[in-house]
Amino acid sequence: MSRIGNRELKIPVGVEVTIQPNNVIVKSAKGQLEQAIPSVITVAAKEGVVTTTRANDVKHSKQLHGTINSLIQGMLEGVSKGFKKELEINGVGYRAALAGNKLTLSLGYSHPIEYKIPQGITITLPKPTQIIVEGISKKLVGEVAANIRNYRKPEPYKGKGIKYKNKHIIRKEGKSAGK
């Protein structure tokens, strides 16, 4: 964990890092992210570089050191480039539609599923069978994509359902006829 925690994080152009006693705030034109910092970790930003140090070598401190460093790196990447997850819908009659801040999914159930899009997330539909989830928070983008996928996970026989783009679904063979 200490090797990850000891790395220096370069601050991208146009990104502002503010360090408070128990909080780190990362701002840019895309938005703002905050992260609470435990008391055993110290964060410093100078000359375009963010560094993290730990107070002692207790196992818990070492774990938090690497975790906080990775979270700050994700924040820096999120406010500069953003994060994106792509989902594909496979199945006859399965489709998605966007109306305001609601995503309506028709997934073979007796009713359409309405998913309220959280603040800070942008969903686009290039096709009715393709969903693109974008935002600055890596955690929130992954969570929203996982929630949408959980409405109808891909099944192994025909591959019907919602899957991540470029993710291979392991297929099973159907029943074979008896002799």
Curated annotation (Swiss-Prot):
The keyword Membrane does not apply. SUPFAM superfamilies: Ribosomal protein L6 (SSF56053). GO terms for molecular function: rRNA binding; structural constituent of ribosome. GO terms for cellular component: cytosolic large ribosomal subunit. Keywords: Ribonucleoprotein, Ribosomal protein, RNA-binding, rRNA-binding. One of its GO terms (biological process) is cytoplasmic translation. This protein binds to the 23S rRNA, and is important in its secondary structure. It is located near the subunit interface in the base of the L7/L12 stalk, and near the tRNA binding site of the peptidyltransferase center. NCBIfam families: L6_bact. Belongs to the universal ribosomal protein uL6 family. PANTHER family: 60S/50S RIBOSOMAL PROTEIN L6/L9, LARGE RIBOSOMAL SUBUNIT PROTEIN UL6M. Part of the 50S ribosomal subunit. This is Large ribosomal subunit protein uL6. It comes from Spiroplasma kunkelii. The lineage of its organism: Bacteria, Bacillati, Mycoplasmatota, Mollicutes, Entomoplasmatales.
